[in-house]
Amino acid sequence: MVLPTLAIVGRPNVGKSTIFNRILGERVSIVEDTPGVTRDRIYGTSEWLGKEFAVIDTGGIDLGDEPFLAQIKDQAEIAIDEADVILFLADIESGVTDADERVAQILYRAKKPVVLAVNKVDNPERRQDIYDFYSLGFGEPYPLSGTHGIGLGDVLDAVLAAFPSEDKSVEDDSIKFSLIGRPNVGKSSLVNAILGENRVIVSPIEGTTRDAIDTKFEAVDETFTMIDTAGIRKRGKVYENTEKYAVMRALRAIDRSDVVLFVINAEEGIREQDKKVAGYAHEAGRGIIIVVNKWDTVEKDNHTMKDFENLIRQEFQYLDYAPIIFVSAKTKQRLQSLPAMIVAVSENQTRRIQSSVLNDVLMDAITVTPTPTVNGKRLRIYYMTQVAVKPPTFVVFVNDPDLLHFSYERFLINQLRQAFDFSGTPIHIIARKRK
């Protein structure tokens, strides 16, 4: 599902990050957060009046040593690229500035819905001053206090009203996948190589609400959708080298994918940013295939591939379920194997196991390794049932959920993996007290 997206834009020091955090804090229920990205997060999901949407804080995107106005321009253009609705933030203390007018000019040309809000209206007596902001050309400005959260409900009501209507008429049962990884691991080359190897149905497919482009193709008797290839192709090096922007694009692609191809550069090995992006794919419960690209550039002996695989398993211990493939976008080495791997992982993501079969495996596991005792109290597991797919999720009914230690939960997951093919997908176990 493609979430409608709100981007917050405005010159520095108008309170974009405060409003961003307020919006994320206003959600009715906690939607999937962004693991691994905390203090410097620029992307999240929220909910207002039952409507889920994504939020981007363009102010969090550091564009380096660019001049002041150039940074504002680039941040506004990022918002235009990414958003369905733009929240244009000014502040009552500074009034209408030249920088505000510059942002307004860029947004006006974009022809995207804009909601104008004036922040820092902490004193009700200042509300009359917001009428100066009509001059920016976006209709009625909404008074807002980020510090106290006053006025945010009215702003979010306006945002929801401006989101495009959902088109539910198109059924799409293709397998959706994306390529993620830090800058310069060869994602763009892999995209082109994969599409070059397979029959593209329509290229490009324009997104319904923004100019991101997905690409459909056929292989191994299946239809695939490669998510957001425009994000890799269009902006290219301009923003690819801005780490936060690259991570944000990866998070958004992951949210829309069934299976994620996590790309590592064989020449450069594993970096910290690799771990951040991979961690989110894992936490989001997506199917994962680890793709080691540029394998043609590595000097090899009989142990090279095994050594690299061992390094991956050591650095990404939580991805022990993810298959690894060594490829070259340049020489097309092993690329023909990728579609079948994606299909297999997608099938494993949706695999359902009958409760009777599950409980046979559970009883065998408990016989081999009895449940632990904590402070003199033994964990008792009565039965297990599967409650969800994508990822496969199982509930175990027990005497006391607090007694199910992480290590025994991991043992049960390993037993499930030995009994059934869950390669490429995380498995979630939830402990519940038997009533």
UniProtKB/Swiss-Prot annotation:
What are the protein's UniProt keywords? GTP-binding, Nucleotide-binding, Repeat, Ribosome biogenesis
Reported function: GTPase that plays an essential role in the late steps of ribosome biogenesis.
Please report which protein family the annotation says this sequence is part of: Belongs to the TRAFAC class TrmE-Era-EngA-EngB-Septin-like GTPase superfamily. EngA (Der) GTPase family.
What PANTHER family is this protein classified in? GTPASE DER (PTHR43834:SF6)
Q: Where is the EngA-type G domain?
A: 4-167, 175-350
Domain KH-like, which positions? Answer: 351-435
Q: Which PROSITE patterns match?
A: G_ENGA (PS51712)
Record flagged with keyword Repeat: yes
The residues that hold GTP 2 are 181-188, 228-232, 293-296
The protein's name? GTPase Der
Q: Which residues bind GTP 1?
A: 10-17, 57-61, 119-122
Matches recorded under SUPFAM superfamilies: P-loop containing nucleoside triphosphate hydrolases
Q: Name one GO molecular function term.
A: ribosome binding
Subunit arrangement? Associates with the 50S ribosomal subunit.
Q: Which GO terms describe its biological process?
A: ribosome biogenesis
What Pfam family is a match for this entry? KH_dom-like
Record InterPro entries: G_ENGA, GTP-bd, GTPase_Der, KH_dom-like, KH_dom-like_a/b, P-loop_NTPase, Small_GTP-bd
